[in-house]
Amino acid sequence: MQYGDKTTFKQSLAIQGRVINALLMREIITRYGRQNIGFFWLFVEPLLMTFFIVMMWKFIRADKFSTLNMIAFVMTGYPMAMMWRNASNRAIGSISANLSLLYHRNVRVLDTIFTRVLLEVAGASIAQILFMAILVMIDWIDAPHDVFYMLIAWFLMAMFAFALGLIICAIAQQFDVFGKIWGTLSFVLLPISGAFFFVHNLPAQAQSIALWFPMIHGTEMFRHGYFGDTVVTYESIGFLVVSDLALLLLGLVMVKNFSKGVEPQ
């Protein structure tokens, strides 16, 4: 294939795959290095944070305040919230860290954002699977009621993380100050992510407000998959899917618009 030749769809997919793979390897080496455990920090980092939260709940004997397994409650809410929060935070610096690579015609701004979000989602996913498996094996939590339903919820929230990452990156690219304060703003959003409460326990008026937030539907859905009918949840898969697609479309349009003004350095 010569420069300027048109490629088939299959060839374009292969090229895109190589670009993403190369960006992933570069990101991993840049962030974690080649020494010590290197790549394994990808999921050790979120795993350790989740471990700290779980142990805190374990030693304050949260079971005294509820008949619900509070460790399972934390595991089905906090890691998912941290996934989209960390993904959006990491997306902000994706372009500045890869400006020199944009000289390559096959590397686009969108690729750099997607790579960072993918890395965060992968790390959070591996940590979640490993830690939940360990907790089930040592009998601290029960086995999930419906794993498939949980996987669908996790996938939809991974889509949300990607869409949010695109939007936040686009805004931060236009307004530098936003990129600096988003870390704090995203932390403030954690309490309304559904990670620390069930919608069912809120007053009726608060429930109607809470259900306008897509991440609450993802958390409720994930917990429904884990606890089954032992808890009352209010998720709407349709609302979450539509929200994800709308945010994704908005994010892609915003990235496309500002990408035209990004110059390689």
Curated annotation (Swiss-Prot):
InterPro entries named in the record: ABC2_TM, ABC2_TM_bact-type, ABC_2_transport
Pfam families: ABC2_membrane
Topology with respect to the bilayer: Multi-pass membrane protein
Places the protein is found: Cell inner membrane
TM region positions: 37-57, 64-84, 118-138, 151-171, 178-198, 235-255
GO MF entries: ABC-type transporter activity
GO CC term (a single one): ATP-binding cassette (ABC) transporter complex
Ranges of residues in domain ABC transmembrane type-2: 37-258
BP-aspect Gene Ontology terms: lipopolysaccharide transport; polysaccharide transport
Matches recorded under PROSITE patterns: ABC_TM2
Disulfide pairings: none
Entry annotated with the keyword Cell membrane: yes
UniProt keyword terms in alphabetical order: Capsule biogenesis/degradation, Cell inner membrane, Cell membrane, Membrane, Polysaccharide transport, Sugar transport, Transmembrane, Transmembrane helix, Transport
PANTHER family in the cross-refs: CAPSULE POLYSACCHARIDE EXPORT INNER-MEMBRANE PROTEIN CTRC (PTHR30413:SF10), INNER MEMBRANE TRANSPORT PERMEASE (PTHR30413)
Family label: Belongs to the ABC-2 integral membrane protein family.
Role of this protein: May form an ATP-driven capsule polysaccharide export apparatus, in association with the BexA, BexC and BexD proteins.
The protein's name in its UniProt record: Capsule polysaccharide export inner-membrane protein BexB
Organism the protein comes from: Haemophilus influenzae
